Amino acid sequence: MPHVSRKEYSSLFGPTVGDKIRLGNTELFIEIEKDLRGYGDESVYGGGKSLRDGMGANNNLTRDNGVLDLVITNVTIIDACLGVIKADVGIKDGKISGIGKSGNPNTMDGVTPTMVVGASTDAISGEHLILTAAGIDTHIHLISPQQAYHALSNGVTTFFGGGIGPTDGSNGTTVTAGPWNIRQMLRSFESLPLNVGLLGKGNACGYGPLEEQIIAGAAGLKVHEDWGATASALRYALRIADKMDIQVAVHTDSLNEGGYVEDTIDAFEGRTVHTFHTEGAGGGHAPDIIKVASLMNVLPSSTNPTLPFGINSQAELFDMIMICHNLNPNVPADVAFAESRVRPETIAAENVLQDMGVISMFSSDSQAMGRVGENWLRLIQTANAMKVARGKLPEDAAGNDNFRVLRYVAKITINPAIAQGVSHVIGSIEVGKMADLVLWDPRFFGAKPKMVIKGGMISWSTMGDSNASLPTTQPITYRPMFGAMGKTMNDTCVTFVSQASLEDGVREKAGLDRNVIAVKNCRNVSKQDLVRNNNMPNIDVDPETFAVKVDGVHATCKPVDIAAMNQLYFFG
């Protein structure tokens, strides 16, 4: 049997088991753990390559016989559930139909039965690329529709949040309030190439106002301090959530007016809740909201303004808070409110707790202190900053950072999907799930995706001058592709609602053309279900110094002055 050198093999088919890949200009290195393809029969598209008629492409089977619509060949997969593996990925009917070996079973050994290539199949060459599940951002202030395009440009295809545009309420709270607003926002998203789940206003000490929003199309509720995050409001929201199987997100009481963090924990009554700001710079009980990350029933996330913790974080946060929450810098009480939320000690601890897998999710807080187009970027920057500051994780192998990278990838893919009740549809690269996928050049991993696949079609991509002789002619910019055009979006995008809303006919009542799918299993999940991020240590906060101790050890880090993939990667 002929042999080729590892270097030559890599140039032809990309890396394989034992090969390592550096992510961007970070200190993070992944190593391929498993190869599902089989050597010698690789599927490759191109002149003189194997995916030709009668060779790697079957010339008898039709699409109805199971032939793929699209295959991504020889790609390196980074997925929180699968690990770091090498495989072909097959897509059919907008869903992932196979992960393994693609090709023609008449001429190739070991072809995965659901991954036959034929005349109905197109191909993306993934030999020198990385594939991840698309990002899910669960903390979206719907202030401007243009957020969608910035999110896609950083590999995010799903929004959970609320708002109706640049109202002061939307600027400060992720809430779409009331049935009329909910229906109009669902209709607006018909023209945006993203999945969406809206959060209704959970601040009501009565079941009627909450239930009508859930039936109208809200996929969850948000209890926010700006509308009054009282213990009573939390109890009502959580009780209706238990009844209707939706998630409740909470931004707790920074001023401790209605009670302290212990009172809020008591109000949870052991029920599942998604804590949005598990560190208080974005809001929440001052100074110790971070303690809730140790609880089994709390699904904790935090947002990208403080991740990674940088030398300018403290300075920029004050102005952010003043603007987002309708505060006046000439009013001493408003200034004191803003200052109470910016604590370098707890911000540093937030970074450490993310690295330890204690805070489980990573979101943006779009245009309301956070940057919607930087979620993957900040995620990988934080992972790198923590490796530099804290060294290797105990779970990592000696020669790679696979566990750390997978822990962070889980924070933006499968864990938000689990928390919001959509992991049966999106969140990981698994057979049967919607093909919401992102292809990355390893040199730009986390910073700039090469291509975004939405529901099995390319919806967003780098693209050169459309009047040029090649697709790679500069200037290369992000542009919408055919998957983001016309009626195709009805098939490639999903609107998430409650089961009660689906049964009430929200699709017909709101005049929606897109796929409408119900969230589920929101109430029977716990911290233990979150992938690679389910640690629950004891957390204490010193009320005077704000120092955070995790199992008695001071959790802190220095602010970074130089972040990976920062100015070197972005001009202007």
Curated annotation (Swiss-Prot):
Binding site for substrate: H224
Enzyme class: hydrolase
Urease domain segment(s): 134-572
Transmembrane segments annotated in the record for this chain: none
GO MF entry, a single one: urease activity
Subcellular location: Cytoplasm
Keywords, alphabetical: Cytoplasm, Hydrolase, Metal-binding, Nickel
Active site as annotated: H325
Chain sites annotated for binding Ni(2+) 2: K222, H251, H277
Record text on subunit structure and interactions: Heterotrimer of UreA (gamma), UreB (beta) and UreC (alpha) subunits. Three heterotrimers associate to form the active enzyme.
Family as reported in the entry's similarity comment: Belongs to the metallo-dependent hydrolases superfamily. Urease alpha subunit family.
PANTHER family, A to Z: UREASE
Protein name: Urease subunit alpha
Native source organism of the sequence: Edwardsiella ictaluri (strain 93-146)
Taxon lineage: Bacteria, Pseudomonadati, Pseudomonadota, Gammaproteobacteria, Enterobacterales
